[in-house]
């Protein structure tokens, strides 16, 4: 069994034979379900360099011994800030790390420390214990999402932003569901702050019977 726990905003903890933490923005996150010191991980996947995604990755990696996986340039950026943390740089494509199959896939967004561009944004497809999970990162919908299902599907659960303003809104995310064809979908990256206020029930209505929409509150988990 694999558990997907929503930690708030775009942060998730995937628990199976390994613990995989994605975009651990916890400190300063008004929706965070846990504190950084309460999280253990084997791998930390970072989708891009914005502070609400890279978050507490370094602190958690230092304490838990987790490896940080990120776009090559972002991995180098992290290494410069924390030479004692093990990083693994990628540049889109598949790999296997500690027995976990990971595909770093494109995302339409930006990636910076707020001033300087750092690498490119991405999403991740993770296969753990026979379960396939897609975390989109911050992105708009794009046609090549259909390839993710074609190459690596079926996708058991897609974690999709619906907040609009910086990412897809409910309408665009519902279109992404059509392209990805996941069995289940969990909305994320909404209602953290006023600019990304959305009603997840509207997203659920737009998806209809194309997938099962599971609306998780921070701290809740989905068992697969």
UniProtKB/Swiss-Prot annotation:
Alphabetical keyword list: Hydrolase
Hydrolase as UniProt keyword: yes
Which InterPro entries does this chain map to?
Metallo-B-lactamas, RibonucZ/Hydroxyglut_hydro, UPF0173, UPF0173_UPF0282_UlaG_hydrolase
Q: Which GO terms describe its molecular function?
A: hydrolase activity
Instruction: List the Pfam families hit by this protein, alphabetically.
Output: Lactamase_B_3
| Family as reported in the entry's similarity comment | Belongs to the UPF0173 family.
Q: What is this protein called?
A: UPF0173 metal-dependent hydrolase TK0141
Per the UniProt record, the source organism is Thermococcus kodakarensis (strain ATCC BAA-918 / JCM 12380 / KOD1) (Pyrococcus kodakaraensis (strain KOD1))
